[in-house]
């Protein structure tokens, strides 16, 4: 179990993201699409085109963590937003 500090914000990147991206690519998406600093300690959540994969990017103060979850059946429900983010 990974515990997040209290006050940590979770940013959901609306739409779909290329799941081939790794640490640097997803950090760049957080900077460009959300105008957010990926090294601020907040959590950034990305969804793939098919909707069956999520990736979570988090800077824990020592380095970036990249977590992934793939569903064997079904899809993650995802918000739609024109600005690229949902709060």
Predicted regions and their residues:
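Polybasic/polar functional segments that serve as interface/processing modules
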Residues: 1-87
């Amino acid at each position: 179990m990974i515990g997040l500090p209290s006050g940590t914000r979770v940013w959901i990147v609306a739409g779909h993201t290329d799941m081939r991206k790794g640490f640097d690519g997803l950090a760049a998406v957080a900077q460009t699409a959300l105008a957010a600093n990926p090294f601020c300690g907040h959590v950034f959540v990305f969804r793939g085109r098919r909707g069956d994969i999520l990736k979570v990017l988090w800077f824990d103060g020592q380095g970036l963590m990249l977590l992934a979850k793939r569903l064997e059946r079904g899809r993650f429900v995802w918000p739609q937003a024109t600005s690229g983010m949902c709060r």
